[in-house]
Amino acid sequence: MNHLLDKTKKILSVGLKSALALPFIASCANKEKPMNILFIMSDDHSYQTISAYDTSFIRTPNLDRIANEGVRFNNSFVANSISAPSRACLLTGKHSLANGFTDNNCTFDGSQQTFPKLIQDKYETAIIGKWHLNSDPTGFNHWDILIGQGDYYNPTFIRNGEKIQREGYATNITTDVALEWLENERDTEKPFCLLLHHKAPHRTWMPDTCDLKLFKDSNFPLPETFYDNYEGRLAAKKNKMSISKDMDLVYDLKLADKDSLIHSNPNLEY
């Protein structure tokens, strides 16, 4: 864990405070001396597991540093909450119906305009880590991406069109590859825009092998709705809606004063 934290600190010290939205990226590119841009994405990462928002579960000092030195959003939304379509929205600045990528089975149309293409004349652009758009990246001078969802252990990457299997844990590898590009492979005459996209903590939520027992003796309180069973709820809702029609019929036939209207549930489940 400490090994990864040290590397994360090193990445954060390359020259970025925070890059959190496309308008900010556009303003960076339009400056007389453009700023470096590092866009870090973690997958299916709930805000409750970032200690800048909630300290109940885990400490995340480097993410907290970004929040403290930059901006923390307390009321934010995504254009699409599905993994790959959300990535397409990020690249294009367009809603899913406009960019053509509506679910995880789609193929991203790389011929359309994206923000890396818009800044590529000024920036050395790269994406490293999870891509998940079922096509080769466009608008990047360098790309080194996981295949599909990617594997947590000994994952296979595609580096500028060439498959490479790397030994180790996906998060560590992605970080190492990013550091190597930043320090030794990019065009240092230009500012950089690096999209560093991690697979973790997407299900199956597998950690580095050294962290497998990190929370072995920890107890986390379950939410009140954890054991809720939603089976049959839709049918119950529709039944409730039909009852309103039955009641309307009773009143329309002027039977309300003459009859008793009774509803019961034999199993008391709803």
Where in the sequence are the language-model features?
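Formylglycine-dependent sulfatase
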Residues: 2, 7-16, 20, 26-270
